[in-house]
Amino acid sequence: MGKHHVTLCCVVFAVLCLASSLAQAQVLFQGFNWESWRKQGGWYNFLHEKVEEIASTGATHVWLPPPSHSVSPQGYMPGRLYDLDASKYGTEAELKSLIEAFHDKNVECLADIVINHRCADYKDSRGVYCVFEGGTPDGRLDWGPDMICSDDTQYSNGRGHRDTGAGFGAAPDIDHLNPRVQRELTDWLNWLRTDLGFDGWRLDFAKGYSAPLARIYVDNTNPTFVVGEIWSSLIYNGDGKPSTNQDADRQELVNWVEGVGKPATAFDFTTKGILQAAVQGELWRLHDGNGKAPGLMGWMPDQAVTFVDNHDTGSTQSLWPFPSDKVMQGYAYILTHPGIPCIFYDHVFDWNLQHEIATLAEIRSRNGIHAESTLDILKAEGDIYVAMIDGKVITKLGPRYDAGGIIPSDFHVVAHGNDYCVWEKEGLRVPAGRKHY
């Protein structure tokens, strides 16, 4: 009896360790860009044909666009939240079929959740657009001006609470301190989970309402993955270049993820800003004063979603683009380093970088690199950056060819491209998604 008990305990422990490792070995894929809504035949149907290719990049999660009716075609000015058939990306049935296809490939799906603000269908007696329609025959999400933040004076009747975050001028800021708002948005999110099959959330403009309020929606909907958009602004010097110390910038991200609690993560805008400056001859930027990575990744890697570009920073908006000729240096960095990397649709399918990105993702997978992998920065100078990850993978960025003899003889090149190279240690590969102990 005792022997069987010990065996069972060992099995349970092994399963728990594997589950923990798999949870950490996450790769996010953004499955759309700013122009995806224009696709003839619908984006959901088009993306359905790409599911297998997306899964082959190593993606464990795919981020899909806002699903509801919206005044803007991209989905970021939502109105009738339950009305998914009015989306420019396709119908509710097509979305559900797409989610099922991803699930068949063991890829979980995140909905882009835009709840900071909302567009009204009708005017009130003042002639102000502040009467909302939920998109159902009943009264769910049918709100009036009472549900708008009192300091959003363009739309509010003054009865709501003050905004708990940054204002959004283009549409009414919703009062998330209102119990009815909390209850009905929670019900809508749970409907997306149970009826549509979504697994988690990407929270748009998450700095528009406080972290404790975001936590309410996370705690009450049980998502497997949550990532918030806290678009922090780097601190710049007088010469227009980023300051060496970006601790205040990444502290904003830390405050949010700690305020929301797990499983919440945040897009690591600090790392993006520093990385895209570093690859332009300033690779010394890729370590902080303590020898760690300089972004959120250096402080809380398990809650840092690293990325090169997205539909805002890149695509046709190009609000803060990564240098186009150095994009693969960006992927060599995020796909071999700690944190949770996010791959952008455009780079895989529109830039013809699928093979290079998939190769790096495979290196990450077969070496068991995960969000909390150990990072040892070996060199960070203007024209060269070299780091070892988990003692198994070495990544070099920059044009300098000679790394100065710091690459051990038992490491061999497994990927290389424009100003990047990746080595792998022989004999230490582990099954995909597992840590090496």
UniProtKB/Swiss-Prot annotation:
EC number, as in UniProt: 3.2.1.1
The entry's keywords: Calcium, Carbohydrate metabolism, Glycosidase, Hydrolase, Metal-binding, Signal
Binding site for substrate: 69-71, 76-77, 202-207, 231, 233, 251, 292, 298-300, 311, 317, 396, 401-403, 413-419, 423
Active site annotation, chain numbering: D204 (nucleophile), E229 (proton donor)
Catalytic activity: Endohydrolysis of (1->4)-alpha-D-glucosidic linkages in polysaccharides containing three or more (1->4)-alpha-linked D-glucose units
Amino acids binding Ca(2+) 3: D152, F168, A171, D173
Family under the similarity heading: Belongs to the glycosyl hydrolase 13 family.
Protein name, UniProt field: Alpha-amylase isozyme 3E
Organism: Oryza sativa subsp. japonica
Gene: AMY1.4
